[in-house]
Curated annotation (Swiss-Prot):
The gene is trmD. Disulfide bonds: none annotated. It comes from Citrifermentans bemidjiense (strain ATCC BAA-1014 / DSM 16622 / JCM 12645 / Bem) (Geobacter bemidjiensis). Its EC number is 2.1.1.228. HAMAP family: TrmD. It is found in: Cytoplasm. GO terms for molecular function: tRNA (guanine(37)-N1)-methyltransferase activity. Specifically methylates guanosine-37 in various tRNAs. InterPro entries: Alpha/beta_knot_MTases (IPR029028), tRNA_m1G_MeTrfase_C_sf (IPR023148), tRNA_m1G_MeTrfase_TrmD (IPR002649), tRNA_m1G_MTases_N (IPR029026), tRNA_MeTrfase_TRMD/TRM10 (IPR016009). This is tRNA (guanine-N(1)-)-methyltransferase.
């Protein structure tokens, strides 16, 4: 999986991309992350990559020519890469979006800055736009880091176990179940007995119900439209009943 990141501030990526899982994935050749300084494609001696907006207004706008040059240089080597723009105007980034991108041959991420990019970048080059949420960051670099991390962990072999991604929050539309490790008791809080029982069928059932319970409590909108299996539907009825009894107390 190849990521090409177009940015005005490539040094921002040194830490997040050179530690832990992403570093190991890169060392194994499972992912490749290339950083490209947009200013390298500027035309003047000052490497100008932004200018005042036509029509007036505050701030600066990223110029189309340097971004176009960077995209064309990258696409010349990886013509099938999908071009993504980080922007508050984009599609909300979620697990399903990350899965979509993980199936691409490569992804080019344009990190927006200032008041945004010249609209002609969108018109001529961008395949899709991504937003992390209803808030504004100082630039798209942090968003790009999030995208690389979320997509990379879905690439086969990146995680220690393929099951790690399979049971993540949102992988099946629900939040993840609670996790415990040693010690079995800490400050009066005990690990649920079922997890110590060795009964894998009952453990799986408990975990599934906990996914439902946690999702119902924290993100009930995620439950809309879920098509339950017969066994899941039975479990969810039990979870709803327990939740109603808890509220009634």
């Amino acid at each position: 999986m190849k990521f090409d990141i177009l940015t005005l501030f490539p040094a921002m990526f040194e830490g997040p991309l050179t530690e832990s899982i992403l570093k190991r994935a890169s060392d194994k050749g499972l992912i490749e992350v290339a950083l490209h300084n947009i200013r390298d494609w500027a035309f003047d001696k000052h490497a100008t990559a932004d200018d005042a907006p036509y029509g007036g207004g505050a701030g600066m706008v990223m110029k189309v020519e340097p971004i176009a040059g960077a995209i064309e240089a990258v696409k010349a080597k990886n013509p099938n890469s999908k071009v993504i723009l980080t922007t508050p105007c984009g599609r909300p980034f979620n697990h399903q979006f990350a899965e979509e991108l993980s199936r691409e041959e490569g992804v080019v991420i344009i990190c927006g800055r200032y008041e945004g990019v010249d609209e002609r970048v969108r018109t001529l080059f961008v395949d899709d736009e991504i937003s992390l949420g209803d808030f504004v960051l100082t630039g798209g670099e942090i968003a790009a880091m999030v995208i690389v991390d979320a997509v990379s962990r879905l690439v086969p072999g990146v995680l220690g176990s393929d099951e790690s991604a399979q049971y993540d929050s949102f992988a099946d539309g629900l939040l993840e179940y609670p996790q415990y490790t040693r010690p079995p008791e800490f400050r009066g809080e005990k690990v649920p007995d079922i997890l110590l029982s060795g009964n894998h069928a009952e453990i799986a059932k408990w975990r599934r119900k906990e996914q439902m319970r946690r999702t119902l409590a924290s993100r009930p909108e995620l439950l809309d439209g879920i098509e339950w299996s017969k066994s899941d539907k039975k479990l969810f009825v039990e979870v709803e009943k327990a939740n109603q009894e808890k509220v009634a107390r």
